[in-house]
A protein has these predicted regions:
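C-terminal regulatory/interaction module of P-loop NTP-utilizing enzymes
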Residues: 1-367
């Protein structure tokens, strides 16, 4: 357990995670109050990484539940090992036959077999999934419930007992209560609103893209091999790309990847040509690439003209109405694109909120 907020910052920094005062305070309170932590924000700002680093910093085992649409409780809580149950019935056929051998009628035989039902629906045949495993674990764990907003609302209801009391009820067996409360971290990309009942049970943290100074500090801490001067320029370029109307804004991890890419190529000067040749490291959709190519010259030099060569070498030309963006249908939107569309966040473009004073309580910047 951490002794202070500063202790949290130092422990996370020791694992390569740069945390500001607000983030460190929230994590400190989570560990002291034994409350789940819900982290919301755009993709790629370090929500999942925080859970991993917390596990490493506290020397706890990490259990992860990756949420997805259509997920049911058998994949999250527990399920019965039917194969094992069937195997036992085959092995115990003779014993079962003895139990019903002197039964005078079918009803009596069924009653006798039913009396043994608890044997087959016992802890012996219970297959734990991440949520139940976190409760039953004898060692301290960090439970990461990743992208809870991707799951159906029914799964949220299943989580309430765990989040509120650190226990899981199995009707056939009973209630399992954690002997050592897990550190529970839930993440959400805000593709939908979460239930108020779930939020009430959690501490809340909003993670946004960090300020330029902090993002530069993060890039430096990763030993990318890029000089400070080039790293500073690169961070400014990435922040400029995030201001564009892109389907997916560049994440912090992609900024780091871009820095490493430029270092591997031995780049000693940033220019629009170099950046355009490597922009696919941070821009992953064809239409976004074209927008980025148009913007890169002015992001490097506001007075620069756009060289025609920047538009060449990024795939063959398309006829009218044709695009590499196969995820889009005739209406120009796919299910995933709809979930990640610009404007999902109340303050503006997805991952690029309106500029507000740093003291605003609703938009703390941290990584």
């Amino acid at each position: 357990m951490f002794d202070s907020v500063q202790d949290v910052r130092e422990a996370l920094a020791g694992e390569g995670y740069i945390a500001d005062e607000h983030l460190a305070t929230t994590v400190f309170l989570q560990t002291r109050l034994d409350k789940p932590l819900l982290i919301e924000g755009p993709a790629g700002v370090g929500k999942t990484e925080l859970a991993k680093v917390l596990a490493a910093a506290t020397d706890r085992r990490l259990l992860r539940l990756q949420c997805y649409e259509g997920q049911d409780e058998t994949k999250a809580l527990y399920e019965w090992d039917y194969g094992k149950q069937l195997l036992y019935t085959q092995i115990l056929r003779e014993k079962i036959a003895q139990i019903v051998s002197d039964a005078t009628d079918l009803e009596t035989a069924v009653e006798r077999i039913g009396a043994q039902e608890s044997v087959f629906f016992s802890d012996r045949f219970l297959a734990s999934r991440p949520l139940l495993e976190a409760v039953r674990s004898e060692e301290p764990v960090v439970l990461l419930i990743d992208e809870i907003d991707r799951a159906d609302e029914a799964l949220e209801a299943v989580l309430l007992e765990l989040l509120g009391e650190y226990q899981v009820s199995v009707p056939e067996v009973g209630t399992f209560t954690a002997t050592c409360a897990p550190y529970v971290v839930l993440t959400s990309n805000n593709t939908r609103d979460l239930a108020a009942a779930l939020k009430r049970r959690c501490l809340h943290l909003f993670l946004d893209y960090p300020a330029a100074e902090r993002e530069l500090e993060i890039v430096r801490s990763k030993d990318t091999g890029l000089t400070d001067a080039l790293a500073t320029q690169l961070v400014d370029v990435v922040r400029g790309l995030r201001e564009l109307d892109l389907r997916k804004a560049p994440s912090i991890s992609e900024t780091i990847d871009w820095a490493r890419t430029l270092a591997v190529l031995g780049v000693d000067e940033l220019n629009a040509k170099v950046l355009s040749d490597t922009v696919s490291v941070v821009v992953k959709y064809d239409k976004d690439v074209h927008k980025a190519l148009d913007a890169l010259p002015r992001l490097v030099d506001p007075n620069a003209a756009v060289p025609e060569s920047l538009h060449n070498g990024h795939g063959h030309s398309h006829g009218p109405g044709h695009s590499h963006d196969h995820d889009h249908g005739p209406d120009g939107k796919a299910v995933r694109a709809e979930k990640d569309r610009p404007g999902r966040f109340a303050d503006g473009y997805y991952g690029t909120p309106k500029k507000t004073p740093s003291s605003s309580p609703g938009r703390r910047r941290a990584f």
